Amino acid sequence: DEVLGLSELPESMLIIGGGVIGCEIGQFFSTLGTEVTIVQRGEQLLPFEDKDVVKQLQRQFKKDKIKVLLNSGVDSCEVVGDEVVSTLSDGKKVNTQYVLVAIGRRPNIENSGIEELGIELNRGKIVVNENLETSVEGIYAIGDLINTPMLAHVASKEGIIAIENAFGKSKTVDYTAVPRCVY
């Protein structure tokens, strides 16, 4: 959240994560002249997008001199002088002025009392059935709390469906054609 408020333009930046946020921020800073390296654990950037579209993006990133390291991770980062030395999973080191962690968000449900209610969690998300009901009958969850696309319009639709189901309906959300964009 703080990266766009930097008081000076970084000379170099390592971005951990090649999802939407990592790619958008990387391209933004590259356009301004920052030397950008993106490290992505998976085999492609934007893992939820079409492979052909991602190939085009990677070609553009190459033209923009954005370095992309796929199937790689960052094991550690250490501030040394005015640089950050990042050690990659293959042992190589990358020196940059800044490191941006863009590996996604998780719901902040610690100390919320959810576990005391007996609501089942899986990897930090609330488990729901097809009707958005949790493991506790009569309690529903939507949006970023559950394992569905983290988009406002998805959460809005889920909210409508959850309310209808709380009043006795048995409706589900169709996730097959969720509009989204990458800037």
Give the positions of each predicted feature:
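Rossmann-like dinucleotide-binding cores of NAD(P)H-dependent redox enzymes
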Residues: 4-5, 10-14, 20-85, 89-90, ...
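FAD-site-proximal beta/loop scaffold in flavoenzymes
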Residues: 1-10, 95-172
